[in-house]
UniProtKB/Swiss-Prot annotation:
It comes from Azorhizobium caulinodans (strain ATCC 43989 / DSM 5975 / JCM 20966 / LMG 6465 / NBRC 14845 / NCIMB 13405 / ORS 571). It is found in: Cell inner membrane. One of its GO terms (molecular function) is proton-transporting ATP synthase activity, rotational mechanism. Pfam families: ATP-synt_B. It is a single-pass membrane protein. F(1)F(0) ATP synthase produces ATP from ADP in the presence of a proton or sodium gradient. F-type ATPases consist of two structural domains, F(1) containing the extramembraneous catalytic core and F(0) containing the membrane proton channel, linked together by a central stalk and a peripheral stalk. During catalysis, ATP synthesis in the catalytic domain of F(1) is coupled via a rotary mechanism of the central stalk subunits to proton translocation. Component of the F(0) channel, it forms part of the peripheral stalk, linking F(1) to F(0). The b'-subunit is a diverged and duplicated form of b found in plants and photosynthetic bacteria. F-type ATPases have 2 components, F(1) - the catalytic core - and F(0) - the membrane proton channel. F(1) has five subunits: alpha(3), beta(3), gamma(1), delta(1), epsilon(1). F(0) has three main subunits: a(1), b(2) and c(10-14). The alpha and beta chains form an alternating ring which encloses part of the gamma chain. F(1) is attached to F(0) by a central stalk formed by the gamma and epsilon chains, while a peripheral stalk is formed by the delta and b chains. This is ATP synthase subunit b 2. It comes from the Bacteria. Keywords: ATP synthesis, Cell inner membrane, Cell membrane, CF(0), Hydrogen ion transport, Ion transport, Membrane, Transmembrane, Transmembrane helix, Transport. Residues 1-18 have a biased composition (Low complexity). InterPro entries: ATP_synth_b/b'su_bac/chlpt (IPR002146), ATP_synthase_B_chain (IPR050059). Residues 1-33 are annotated as: Disordered.
Amino acid sequence: MVVAQAGAPAHPPAAHGAEAGHGEAAGGEHGGFPPFKPQHFASQLIWLIVSFGALYFLMSRVTLPRIGRILEERHDRIAKDLEEARLRQAESEAAQAAYEKALTEARGKANAIAGEARARLAAETDANRKSLEENLNAKLADAERRIASTKATALSHVRGIAVDTTGAIVTALVGTPAGNQDVESAVDAALAAKSA
């Protein structure tokens, strides 16, 4: 260890000689980067070959096979996913076709049911209308019979009323009562002329 003394230079002259000896042992030249010196090329080439050989061995035996497996797994996974997507798409298209077919069948059934219901309602309506018409015709015929009977009864009373009224008018005008037979024959003649 070198200790600087007071008044002495920090680096003794012997130290310069040692540095000079070190420089001479290193090739006697000052300066220059050792890897660029031609006398070191042989050892550097050997280490270069060893380093690249080890790197090549590690890359070819460890790293590249791993990368290859990873790429192959990714490729297989992508192919599997694409195949599964194709299957799902085919299933989806089949389901859509089945849905459309079922929808078409349901529409056809609904139209058939609606047609049957319309036909049934039309038949029921026709049957009800015919029944109602028959019922109304029967009531109308019965009413016409009653009207005819009432008319005949009323007309038979009209003759009697006409005979009584005519007799009363003749009595009021002439002052003496007319004979029943004369009044009845006059009323019958007037009724016969009116109905003809």
